[in-house]
């Protein structure tokens, strides 16, 4: 199973140390819960229609929820696109003027990247409804569905051959899965398959990223973008546009300069268009001609090349406080900033103020609806991560320091306790290691937190009154994100002691260690429900749902939210999208509606 590439961004770096399953018995919860979480998904994206060079762009069906990955029908009269306007990602169709709007798929699973067949009768798309991202075909007249690829790994970006007999797609089924601390890199190759699922053929063998395929009009070549693994970090390296002969496998590199180049398409014969990214990015054409500048994502052109559609982010206000779609009605979701924590009365919320990849984080306090925001704590030299309210609501604990090893100064951080006005800050640790991610005991007398340092890894419990420290776990394994049960009897945490990261629980006296998850890939960010009956966590078990290079940079684009009972049973999926969802916490029971 795939695991995300954790590069230099917040949800990755907080997991790193400085250098050196239950049964699926389902029952309906007696209570209705609310989980707050952070996501690297765009706040909102809209689709735009423009001239073939990207000029004269105008919004198409602007909506407060995500619309993206649009493409034209073969006759150019309609547009199919993905939207989350009704919760989960589904595929819609509308005329060029936006009417009539028709929902083509309706499933709690992730449906995306839809393209209509050359005869206009079928829709190929990516769906997770079988448990991973596969290529599916929907017969538009009858609604009949079939899974074309049906493989345990991820298949993405379908493209119809001009005769409608074949589909080209990218897949990470042969990914190299190089280990990089918390996760692995996703690599993809280009494949062909007949529409009945037969004749599977691997086209590229680059052991890197080959994706976004598109057919030539004579069916002899496939166009795609290509990049080395080293180009997929937060500072993206160069990528190129390549054409491959399907008969001889001869590659022709169509570009050779620096910068990012993605999503190539043949338009109006042999002309090749693509998009570039960066401060001067926009629409490009092989040969040097430039189109409109600006952020252009997932472009598609009409058959004659006179029009194009694309999406871009249209809202950047941060942090958000808004409802999120949940696959389980008993567990409502609220998207917030990183590391949300509610006061015991539920009348105030603290979060970190920055998005991913920022070295300095302050703590914001606000009302639960996001209003009345103010900076509770900030420091010019140190970052404050993972604030958490005390059970009595009179104090807030947080990690404070330089968490990002190898970037700016030594990677040391401490555990701080402050009053709810951000004053009276008291440091509990000695500054000799990377301490972080505190969690209160139910009586408010102790804190459990992560210790990481040279030859020092584990979990530590501190007496808040005296500052006395007690080792809970220690060893070469990386134990992280402890969460103290409201019942007081167990502490949940993430550990790689048995290979990849899984969720464990342990008694506060260090006895009775139990492993709760046993899934290929990493499980992390565990948090107890207010009644101690459930644990929410992030897992990559659902795999990638798109090429990671085509999503806004985040190191784990396949992290979804899941819940399970306190003993690891009754595991349920809450989110199902192509973005990283993480750092969950719970709204107090008294604030549930």
Residue ranges and their predicted role:
Residues 39-47, 61-66, 82-92, 105-111, ...:
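A flexible loop/linker signature enriched in serine peptidases of the S9 family
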Residues 51-55, 95-99, 139-143, 194-198, ...:
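Short loop/turn segments that connect beta-strands within beta-propeller blades
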Residues 35, 79, 123, 167, ...:
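Hydrophobic beta-strand positions that form the internal "hydrophobic ladder"
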Residues 23-52, 56-58, 62-72, 333-345, ...:
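Beta-strand-rich domains and repeat architectures in extracellular enzymes and scaffolds
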Residues 57-58, 101-102, 146, 201, ...:
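A structural motif specific to WD40 beta-propellers
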Residues 7-17:
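Bacterial N-terminal signal peptides
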């Amino acid at each position: 199973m795939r695991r995300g590439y954790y590069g230099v961004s917040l949800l990755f770096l907080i997991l790193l140390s400085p250098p050196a399953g239950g049964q699926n018995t389902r029952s309906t919860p007696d209570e209705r819960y609310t989980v707050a979480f952070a996501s690297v998904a765009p706040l909102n994206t809209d689709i735009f229609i423009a001239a073939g060079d990207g000029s004269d762009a105008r919004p198409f069906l602007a909506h407060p929820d995500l619309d993206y990955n649009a493409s034209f029908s073969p006759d150019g009269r309609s547009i199919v696109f993905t939207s989350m306007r009704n919760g989960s990602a589904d595929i819609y169709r509308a005329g060029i003027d936006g009417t009539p709007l028709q929902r083509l798929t309706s499933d709690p699973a992730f449906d995306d990247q839809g393209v209509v067949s050359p005869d206009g009768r079928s829709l190929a798309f990516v769906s997770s409804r079988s448990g991973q991202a596969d290529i599916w075909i929907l017969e538009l007249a009858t609604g009949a569905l079939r899974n074309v690829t049906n493989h345990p790994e991820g298949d993405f970006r379908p493209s119809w051959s001009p005769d409608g007999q074949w589909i080209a797609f990218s897949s990470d089924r042969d990914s190299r899965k190089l280990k990089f601390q918390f996760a692995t890199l996703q690599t993809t190759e280009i494949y062909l398959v007949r529409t009945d699922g037969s004749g599977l053929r691997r086209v590229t063998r680059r052991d890197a990223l080959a994706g976004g395929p598109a057919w030539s009009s004579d069916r002899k070549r496939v166009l795609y973008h290509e990049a080395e693994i080293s180009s997929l970090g937060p500072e993206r390296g160069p990528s190129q546009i390549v054409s491959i002969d399907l008969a001889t496998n001869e590659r022709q590199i169509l570009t050779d300069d620096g910068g990012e180049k993605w999503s190539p398409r043949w338009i109006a014969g042999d002309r090749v268009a693509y998009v570039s990214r960066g401060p001067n990015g926009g629409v490009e054409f092989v040969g040097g001609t430039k189109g409109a500048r600006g952020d252009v994502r997932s472009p598609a052109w009409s058959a004659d090349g006179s029009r194009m559609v694309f999406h871009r982010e249209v809202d950047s206000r941060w942090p958000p406080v808004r409802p999120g779609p949940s696959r389980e009605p008993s567990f409502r979701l609220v998207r917030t900033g990183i590391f949300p924590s509610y006061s015991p009365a539920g009348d105030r919320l603290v979060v970190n103020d920055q998005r991913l990849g920022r070295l300095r984080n302050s703590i914001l306090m606000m009302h639960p609806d996001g209003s009345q925001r103010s900076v509770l704590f900030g420091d010019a030299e140190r970052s404050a991560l993972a604030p958490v309210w005390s059970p009595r609501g009179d104090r807030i604990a947080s990690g404070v320091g330089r968490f990002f090893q190898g970037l700016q100064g030594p990677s040391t951080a401490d555990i701080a306790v402050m009053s709810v006005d951000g004053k009276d800050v008291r440091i509990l640790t000695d500054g000799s290691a990377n301490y972080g991610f505190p969690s209160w005991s139910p009586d408010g007398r102790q804190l459990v937190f992560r210790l990481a340092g040279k030859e020092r890894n584990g979990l530590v419990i501190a007496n808040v009154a005296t500052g006395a420290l007690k080792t809970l776990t220690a060893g070469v394994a990386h134990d992280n994100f402890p969460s103290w049960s409201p019942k007081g009897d167990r502490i949940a945490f993430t550990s790689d002691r048995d290979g990849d990261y899984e969720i464990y629980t342990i008694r506060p006296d260090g006895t009775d260690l139990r492993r709760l998850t046993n899934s290929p890939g990493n499980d992390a960010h565990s948090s107890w429900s207010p009644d101690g009956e459930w644990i929410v966590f992030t897992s990559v078990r659902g795999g990638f749902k798109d090429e990671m290079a085509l999503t806004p940079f985040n190191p784990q684009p396949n992290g979804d939210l899941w819940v399970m009972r306190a003993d690891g049973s009754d595991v349920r999926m809450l989110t199902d999208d192509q973005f990283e969802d993480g750092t969950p916490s719970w709204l107090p029971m008294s604030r549930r509606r």
